[in-house]
UniProtKB/Swiss-Prot annotation:
Binding site for ATP: 75, 93, 106-110
SUPFAM superfamilies hit by this protein: RuvA domain 2-like, YojJ-like
Domain of life, source organism: Bacteria
Keyword Transferase: yes
PROSITE patterns the record matches: DAC
Upper classification of the organism: Bacteria, Bacillati, Bacillota, Bacilli, Bacillales
Keywords: ATP-binding, DNA damage, DNA repair, DNA-binding, Magnesium, Nucleotide-binding, Nucleotidyltransferase, Transferase
Name recorded for this polypeptide: DNA integrity scanning protein DisA
Family: Belongs to the DisA family.
Activity regulation information from UniProt: Diadenylate cyclase activity is inhibited by the interaction with RadA.
Requisite cofactors: Mg(2+)
Length: 357
């Protein structure tokens, strides 16, 4: 899993470097349109130095126009690691010929071998096929046309909207069952599955956004709007149902996101994520602590909610508490006690209305 996380992080960094709207991508696109082909290496460490033969040391500031003009020469361009300077033009690269390569063309084969030998980012721009291929270590990624990525991103947004609706239905139903005191592990796991799918699609959309660069601003806005408060509420759901009382609910949600990236989760995986044995029956009754529901009461800060739960232990305990009992809790006066009672009643009514709409 750690290796996969590192791989994803590397890919994000690479895509951000060559995303539309960046000077480097502008220069690459110019070379692509001119159909001259090109080979660009980012980074000039000792390993790169050992495989560079010849070339002109120019050490000038990067500009898209400079890249375009210098790429007309047959050799490779060597840039610094951030792509802000062009160090060498028309360099011949001589990587180890014993390094395996799946590529057939000389330019792409050289690019793959240089990337594997040095770990540097290498960009190969095809002369005839209008394709940009990125290599770094064993990573190989072909940049897609912006129109194709936008179409996929919009499809993913539509899918996310559907799973958001599933989440809304599940969390509404769970809220009603919480007030009725009939929640089982099955309902909690069902809602967590919808969180899993939302997080999985979110990660896919983020990868499109990284690749779209400045073209992905609208997609990012849609994603932010769709996920508003969902992750915060999911973290409180975990805090409600984790077997032992925990303050690490955000870390547990992060772990769920990492697991969602690598595999489809079984019910037992989600049960274990909540701190229970994997063989726990889904029909087992569970009781919420009440963090999620009480957080919906207006003007009740988290510290007061923490005091409430510490005193009454569960949502049912808070709901059954009298005005005087609520008044006894630190930070709650008579006025706030009444607001809490009224707030809980309004939330319950809203949940019933939502289910029947």
């Amino acid at each position: 899993m750690e290796e996969n996380k590192q791989r994803v992080k590397s890919m994000i960094n690479i895509l951000q470097l060559v995303a539309p709207g960046t000077p480097l991508r502008e220069g690459i696109d110019n070379v692509l349109r001119a159909q001259t082909g090109g080979l660009i290496v980012l980074g000039y460490n000792e390993q790169i130095k050992s495989i560079v033969d010849g070339g002109f040391h120019i050490n000038c500031a990067f500009s898209p126009a400079s890249l375009y003009e210098l790429a007309k020469m047959d050799g490779a361009l060597i840039l610094n690691e951030t792509g802000s300077k062009i160090l060498i033009a028309n360099a011949q690269l001589v990587p180890e010929s014993s390094i395996d390569s799946i590529e057939t063309g000389m330019r792409h084969r050289t690019a793959e071998r240089v990337a594997k030998q040095t770990g540097s980012l290498v960009v190969a721009i095809s002369q005839r096929r209008n394709v940009i291929t990125l290599y770094q270590g064993n990573l190989r990624y072909t940049l897609k046309d912006i129109g194709v990525i936008l179409t996929k991103a919009n499809q993913a947004i539509q899918t996310l909207e559907k799973y958001k609706a599933v989440w809304n239905d599940g969390i509404t139903n769970l809220g009603i069952l919480e007030f009725e005191e009939v929640v089982t592990m099955s309902e909690v796991v069902h809602v967590l599955h919808s969180v899993e799918m939302v997080l999985r699609i979110k990660n896919e959309i983020l990868s499109y956004i990284h690749e779209l660069g400045t073209e992905g601003r609208l997609i990012r806005l849609q994603l932010t709007e769709l996920l508003a408060d969902l992750e915060a509420e999911a973290a409180l759901l975990i805090k409600d149902y984790y077997q032992e009382k925990t303050q690490d609910h955000h870390q547990i949600l992060k772990k769920l996101q990492e697991l969602a990236n690598t595999q489809l989760l079984e019910d037992s995986d989600l049960v274990k994520l909540l701190g229970y044995p994997g063989q726990t029956s889904l029909e087992e009754s569970v009781t919420p602590r009440g963090y999620r529901i009480t957080s919906k009461i207006s003007r009740v800060p988290p510290l007061i909610i923490e005091n409430l739960i510490n005193r009454f232990k569960t949502l049912q305990g808070v709901c059954r508490a009298t005005i005087n009992e609520l008044d006894d809790v630190e930070g709650i006066g008579e006025v706030r006690a009444k607001k809490i009672r009224e707030g809980l009643k309004r939330i319950q009514e809203h949940l019933y209305m939502s289910r029947h709409n």
